[in-house]
């Protein structure tokens, strides 16, 4: 499987993009030529090439997530019902991410 050449749309397939992995995909995209070579059109047009690229990118992200699934935090409940500071927080929204205190830069004057 050859690496996709982004200036030649006919070389872009989901499998080729997926085979690069996320690191290789970022490097290949950054090193891509800006000039489009119209003598190598994609069979489904430019939109088809874009669709294949996005499918390959999604598959590469999925592979990355599966590979590192054991290296991430366990999912947490969305609402912190048993939190010690529950009484300080409003009874709606994402309590786990809501800070009960307003943090301000001490150098900034407060507004009246």
Curated annotation (Swiss-Prot):
This is Small capsomere-interacting protein. Keywords: Capsid protein, Host nucleus, Virion. Interacts with the major capsid protein/MCP. InterPro entries: Herpes_UL35. The keyword Cytoplasm does not apply. One of its GO terms (biological process) is viral process. Participates in the assembly of the infectious particles by decorating the outer surface of the capsid shell and thus forming a layer between the capsid and the tegument. Complexes composed of the major capsid protein and small capsomere-interacting protein/SCP assemble together in the host cytoplasm and are translocated to the nucleus, where they accumulate and participate in capsid assembly. One of its GO terms (cellular component) is host cell nucleus. It comes from Human herpesvirus 2 (strain HG52). Belongs to the herpesviridae small capsomere-interacting protein family. It is found in: Virion; Host nucleus. It holds the Pfam family Herpes_UL35.
């Amino acid at each position: 499987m050859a690496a996709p050449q982004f200036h030649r749309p006919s070389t872009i397939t989901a499998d080729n993009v997926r085979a690069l992995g996320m690191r290789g995909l970022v490097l290949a995209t950054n090193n891509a030529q800006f000039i489009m070579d119209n003598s190598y059109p994609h069979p489904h047009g430019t939109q088809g090439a874009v669709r294949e690229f996005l499918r390959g990118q999604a598959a590469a992200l999925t592979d990355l997530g599966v590979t590192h699934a054991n290296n991430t935090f366990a999912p947490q409940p969305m609402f912190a019902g048993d939190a010690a500071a529950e009484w300080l927080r409003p009874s709606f929204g994402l309590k786990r991410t809501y800070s009960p205190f307003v943090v301000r830069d001490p150098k900034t004057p407060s507004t009246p």
